Amino acid sequence: MTPIQEQLIALGGVFQAAVLVDRIAKTGQVSEAALSCMLGSLLVVDPKDTLDVYGGDDLNLHEGYRAMASALERDPATLQREPLRYALSMLGLERQLAKRDDLLEIIGKRIPVIQSQVEHFGIAHENVIAATGALYEDTLSTLRQRIQVQGDMRNLQQPNNASKIRAILLAGIRSARLWRQVGGHRWQLVFSRRKLLKELYPLLHG
């Protein structure tokens, strides 16, 4: 796997999270498989490669790849505006989080607690979702930059949906951190679009 492929997979995780947040906000729905993949990505501590974080299958990130491709292509007809906004916000929040050792310590201590809940209840259980959402609220929500989620207020006001959105945002920011760790930089999204798209299309259509 090339460095660019590793970066695209991690960035695909960011965009996958963004797409799912947008879907919950607008429809109140998300598949258990998609939710489980995102929550599971928070708990993988020793992956053999970047794809292993997302269950080892590109299909798990297909919607994220598609949203990323539309952003890189800059085609107004296919651009998914809200997911793009959420993805860029997550990249920005990750930069703020990286400077806060106190928040990273809280996350580091509470992820194993969530892992033990997963072993007891299963990964998509409402207790796990609530605990993961609360972790986002206690850490990322305290930063100056906030992600404003747009959608149907009836969906956004349901506590379970709000917890799912926060939990998925936490997973997306974990993906943003992974993207940085494998060499990703925001300037690539501006200056290396064609190169990224060339490597992304095989992942998208594979």
UniProtKB/Swiss-Prot annotation:
It is found in: Cytoplasm; Cell inner membrane. SUPFAM superfamilies: YcfC-like. It comes from the Bacteria. Its main location: cytoplasm. NCBIfam families: PRK00218.1-2 (NF001246), PRK00218.1-3 (NF001247). It comes from Pseudomonas syringae pv. tomato (strain ATCC BAA-871 / DC3000). This is High frequency lysogenization protein HflD homolog. The gene is hflD. It is a peripheral membrane protein. One of its GO terms (cellular component) is cytoplasm. InterPro entries: HflD, HflD-like_sf. The keyword Membrane applies. Keywords: Cell inner membrane, Cell membrane, Cytoplasm, Membrane. It holds the Pfam family DUF489. Belongs to the HflD family.
